[in-house]
């Protein structure tokens, strides 16, 4: 039985944890060992305990951010992206410019196809570390992927609207082929009727 299970095996068990950064750091180190061995569930338990032992003072904000970020790395490895995003966001509330965590959350957003959020995170990273070529290339890749997704969604919507329009206009002996759509420079469309 895992040492953690002794404390949590009974639902009425309440455990008071005294805040201790040395204990928190030791638990994090143990979590790191399990993470390297790919025992993610066990690593999560250690990181969670590290979080509970970490003092809530401002001087320990970075440590808290690291503990949450490390736990998020476990969730990423387990493809539990929503939980990874949640832990990354918590870590960033303690350390807003922690690039490693922003990048981890960016990857999680991309994994669940929330490309707008992924692009926002990579833009934030580039703002923090402007000269990093790797981040600039990643920014370009994600922006391109987002534009492709938006274009595909726009095409799908236009096809659906065209189908609906043809259904309605068909009752009057017309189709959308009688209408010419022209896109203006500002992104809007004008419609011209042709017989």
Model-derived features: positions:
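Alpha-helical tetratricopeptide repeat
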Residues: 1-195
